[in-house]
């Protein structure tokens, strides 16, 4: 098989363009959002610190009062001392409880916000990547996007080890397979994909195709509880891990600066 170096070079250039666009339009907004979140968290921790200082000041005031009362040495002194000590414990417990609630609410907010962020990120980046990939591949190469997806997926099937192949083939022979893609594959590409699946898993396998506009760019084959796929979802997962690491590092920095 001859390698079309022009196509390979074009795809490499396309990938670099895509990385540059992601860096320009994705990481910048993410960092700004984290900066705003850091400011809000710093304000919350400052409020908690003020309450702690107020409780500490109250404790110091009560200690001073205790010292004065101790000089009186009487029955009333012990009663007042007990009341003051009880009140001190209540105030400190309330301050600690409020600080703990603020920190717990902040942690829950971080988890919810990050989950929502990555859900929206996958949705938006997936849509933009699909449009960019279609246009770029159409401009820079003669291979259509759908054809490239089918070729890569067939290569993925051919690379299965013997155990994986036997496991999937057994399930497929009993239940058939369902192939999903984000857009409708032309008949000739469906035939090519069907041929690749049957060569890898068995000639008598029943196949069904389904369009899923909400799925990431790629092809997914499911057999019962088994799933094989090739697409950009793995890149999303790596991007999610990278951003999560950055997000957690920022949150840890704020936590270390808190009391």
Swiss-Prot record:
Keywords recorded for this protein, A-Z = ATP synthesis, Cell inner membrane, Cell membrane, CF(0), Hydrogen ion transport, Ion transport, Membrane, Transmembrane, Transmembrane helix, Transport
| Gene Ontology MF term list | proton-transporting ATP synthase activity, rotational mechanism; proton-transporting ATPase activity, rotational mechanism
GO CC annotation = plasma membrane; proton-transporting ATP synthase complex
CDD domains the UniProt entry points to: ATP-synt_Fo_b
Q: Which Pfam families match?
A: ATP-synt_B
Spell out the subcellular localization from the entry: Cell inner membrane
Primary role: F(1)F(0) ATP synthase produces ATP from ADP in the presence of a proton or sodium gradient. F-type ATPases consist of two structural domains, F(1) containing the extramembraneous catalytic core and F(0) containing the membrane proton channel, linked together by a central stalk and a peripheral stalk. During catalysis, ATP synthesis in the catalytic domain of F(1) is coupled via a rotary mechanism of the central stalk subunits to proton translocation.
Binding partners and assembly: F-type ATPases have 2 components, F(1) - the catalytic core - and F(0) - the membrane proton channel. F(1) has five subunits: alpha(3), beta(3), gamma(1), delta(1), epsilon(1). F(0) has three main subunits: a(1), b(2) and c(10-14). The alpha and beta chains form an alternating ring which encloses part of the gamma chain. F(1) is attached to F(0) by a central stalk formed by the gamma and epsilon chains, while a peripheral stalk is formed by the delta and b chains.
Protein family per UniProt: Belongs to the ATPase B chain family.
Name used for this protein in its record: ATP synthase subunit b 2
Q: Which gene encodes it?
A: atpF2
């Amino acid at each position: 098989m001859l390698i079309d170096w022009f196509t390979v070079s074009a795809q490499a250039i396309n990938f670099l363009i895509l990385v540059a666009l992601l860096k320009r339009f994705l990481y910048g907004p993410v960092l700004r959002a984290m900066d705003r979140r850091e400011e809000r968290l710093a304000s919350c921790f400052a409020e908690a610190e003020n309450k702690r200082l107020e409780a500490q000041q109250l404790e110091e005031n009560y200690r001073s009062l205790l010292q004065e009362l101790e000089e009186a040495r009487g029955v009333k002194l012990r009663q007042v001392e007990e009341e003051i000590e009880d009140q001190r414990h209540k105030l400190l417990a309330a301050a600690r409880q409020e600080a703990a609630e603020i920190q717990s609410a902040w942690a829950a907010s971080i988890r919810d916000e990050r989950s929502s962020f990555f859900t929206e990120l996958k949705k938006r980046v997936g849509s933009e990547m699909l449009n960019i990939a279609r246009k770029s591949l159409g401009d820079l190469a003669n291979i259509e996007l759908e054809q490239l997806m089918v070729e890569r997926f067939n290569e993925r099937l051919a690379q299965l080890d013997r155990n994986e192949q036997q496991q999937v083939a057994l399930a497929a022979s009993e239940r058939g397979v369902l192939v999903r893609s984000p857009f409708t594959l032309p008949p000739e590409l469906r035939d090519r994909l069907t041929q690749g699946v049957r060569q890898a898993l068995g000639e008598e396998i029943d196949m069904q195709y389904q369009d899923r506009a909400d799925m990431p760019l790629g092809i997914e084959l499911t057999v019962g509880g088994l799933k094989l796929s090739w697409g950009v979802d793995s890149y999303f997962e790596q991007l999610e891990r990278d951003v999560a690491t950055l997000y957690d590092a920022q949150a840890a920095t704020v936590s270390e600066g808190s009391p």
